[in-house]
Design a protein with these regions (language model features):
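Small-residue-enriched hydrophobic alpha-helices in membranes
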Residues: 1-120
């Protein structure tokens, strides 16, 4: 459950780091939210408020946040999981049909942290 939350955090900041929230990205996050019970939805809403604060502090803060999250996961998930999550994050990035510089940078950071090749 904690792993899912961390992945939600990463997906959320990636989808918002271009500071243009496309309707496709919104749909995607609402699909994720639909999987959760009402109690968990409340928790996720609080998390998004926290994540919005991180985003408001600028891309350097977001970068540090993603580095610390990906570091904490490094030894907890195997390579197959890393690849699956990177694919998921890539999907989130591609939803608005364009790759913003910030999205590319965060994706590359994740790839580097997890010893994977970036294909964006």
């Amino acid at each position: 459950h904690l792993l899912e939350l961390v992945m939600f955090d990463i997906a959320y900041v990636i989808s918002n780091c271009d500071y243009e929230y496309s309707s496709d990205e919104k749909k995607y996050l609402s699909v994720i939210l639909d999987r959760y019970s009402d109690d968990d939805k409340e928790l996720l809403k609080l998390r998004t408020q926290f994540l919005d604060n991180v985003l408001d502090k600028g891309i350097e803060e977001v970068k540090n946040f993603v580095i610390s999250l990906s570091n904490s996961l490094k030894s907890k998930i195997d390579d197959d999981m890393k690849i699956a999550y990177l694919d998921l994050f890539k999907e989130v990035i591609m939803l608005d049909k364009s790759v913003h510089e910030n999205e590319r940078m965060l994706y590359r950071i994740l790839c580097e942290q997890w010893d994977q090749k970036s294909n964006i």
